[in-house]
């Protein structure tokens, strides 16, 4: 209809312009009809004349070169010598597009006795879709040919149902083609009694698709965290190439997907991969993959959920036949119970485990676990439950970021059993256990009897008030009723306990008098008083016993200078630190304390498979308290949390499974800095004496020998062996093991100390403490005894709380229920129990005094008593140590500033010492030796402080929160003393 309308419009336009159809004639004259018949080799000249510019449209495009070049109202088509190829229809049209519907045509037959049919010079293979029409250009060169037929090339007739129309001027028209028509065909006709055939036409009909493409998504839902990468694969296939795949989202545009095409038998498979590099909350919704072909479209949809945080959600799934209230389940003996839990989790679960009352047994209940995308179902099958199997059943699950658990409490219906007990002269108690909770009734019968007969008038309920209370015991509920009777009574009582399951009873005969009551009451009272006093004394002694704890603390700043300590037990432990216990060979003990010890060990395969490394191993004693084991695990977690640094004793591994906890750290062969300084004191003095004009210092080290054995050191560990880890001299004449890791070799240190060494020790410790401060870690026990030395005299910070006998170490003073290194502590730590990085700076200043006095104890000749606390509170500072340059003493005084905010940072301290290290090669310290102030001098300095209101106060304060009456205590949130 539409094309007919266009044709009419074209005619009307031509009429409006006054044009008529162009006219075709032969050069020799007018046409006799619409056909022109020529012999092969004859000339052909057609002339077209119209009302405007015209041109010819020949059958073959290559014949356009025979059209005259001039453009005008008259055009000619001229061929000097024709062939059968010129057979066809020639059309004359206006060149103006508006007049394309005005045309004329003529058909030319070029006869040749050898050729009856002409065909296009292009391919004779025709491909059509099922249901379309197909025109085969099988043209006759002679209109007088007869007996035209159309058949297969093999001689068979055309297929049944083929609708054929033949026009000698156009060819064979096949309507509504079908895949059954696929074959090779020829046209046949007779001329002069002989049959002639055309070239072979090959027909290939593509079957019409009756079904949309197959579309498949592996998952019907996805869960992702914000920022994660999403990749969805959509698998499709189709019988041919004529289809496409698209992606759509319920609310937003999606990026272009990548496609991979393969052949699967006779079908084409396209895998479309949609990738979103970083999902956002707005991506939440339905994502659809659609495959479309001529038969229609097919799609598959998946749901995407984008969340901000990981999650684990647990919900119980219990049979409706079970009697339960929430997670509490009531069963009878011999029942079967299925405990089901529905789990939703992302990231995916990494582990799941049931904990049952019989987990210690070799045979556990049957459990099943099902997984579908990010949803799971855990099922525990309990068959024929008995009394030993009742209790709590807990499912623990975790993924890479969270953990969760759910607990079912199974209780078994139990018939009650009653037991009567004589508490004292006038009191009886009846206890019964059962489930549900039993009820108790008392009955009496006169006289002394073994039983009271039932259903008689002698058995009477006791009209007295009873007190009942419930308590859980092994899944059953315990009920106790107390009966009070008067003196001078002879009676038999019956206690009856009953519940839904049944009842139980017990009979008791009693004879009460006042004399028995008085003596029994007095004896019971005395015994209870003695036991109470003994219990109070034992609790006091137990609380006085110190517990092992790592001094290091991780903090987080909240508001200004207010800090909150992070519970180290909540820090994660990375299993990558686990080291095989069988590859660790323990050696001699390097140090031992009240809670544990440090031993030398050899680790095989640490770092690299063929490495043999000397290490130090921390462990607890066999009698260690569970709290102390948790403290060692906290130390392990803190060390793994901090990471590696050259100036701390670094964690190398740990053994936490299959035995006691072992913490593997670097081995520092030269022991602690305090004893190293003392052992090198004489050499240092000799070195100082060689400096021209250096006055002989009046020190306590004139008679120090390098071979001296320290029976008791400030480190707090008794030692008689020269190579003990804490109270040690440098290792001498140790056999060399070529198989050991070179980093673990210990060379004898025979070099004397010099000023550069003291400055380097100070700088390295400052760098280590700066690293700890950057990690929000407070050391709380900075002292020379807690610094170890490795090869090349590299200082490393450690914590010897495990292997130090603080009970017998004079450096640790009792305050409240703890022992603290008071002489190294900042005022705010002593008086307010506040520990910050600035309090570590104060302790570092004390450690500098130790270094530059070659290991002397700070505040010499001053006892830790009320006077000492008063001196500290009033700002007393030690004088410059024997060998400290003035610049270093300035740093010490900066560290001892009473205002914690005014103390320098470790980074600043490190920079100042580094500058001094650069100047020591050009300068010599000529400062004269200064004696340590005596206690009298300290008192004189104290008097200048003029304390007004603290003269009579005791400074033996405690950090225990219960002792709030102490005048120097201030309430705070940092009670770690």
From Swiss-Prot:
Residue stretches spanning the membrane: 520-540
PROSITE patterns: IG_LIKE, PROTEIN_KINASE_ATP, PROTEIN_KINASE_DOM, PROTEIN_KINASE_TYR, RECEPTOR_TYR_KIN_III
GO CC terms, sorted: CSF1-CSF1R complex; plasma membrane; receptor complex
Residues glycosylated per entry: 98, 101, 154, 163, 244, 286, 298, 361, 424, 455
Record's comment on post-translational modification: Autophosphorylated in response to CSF1 binding. autophosphorylation, leading to its degradation. Ubiquitinated. Becomes rapidly polyubiquitinated after autophosphorylation, leading to its degradation.
Domain named Ig-like C2-type: residues: 22-109, 120-198, 213-305, 316-407, 408-513
InterPro entries linked to this entry: CSF-1_receptor, Ig-like_dom, Ig-like_dom_sf, Ig-like_fold, Ig_sub, Ig_sub2, Kinase-like_dom_sf, Prot_kinase_dom
Catalytic activity: L-tyrosyl-[protein] + ATP = O-phospho-L-tyrosyl-[protein] + ADP + H(+)
Assembly notes: Monomer. Homodimer. Interacts with CSF1.
Assigned protein family: Belongs to the protein kinase superfamily. Tyr protein kinase family. CSF-1/PDGF receptor subfamily.
Protein name (Swiss-Prot/TrEMBL): Macrophage colony-stimulating factor 1 receptor
Originating species: Danio rerio (Zebrafish)
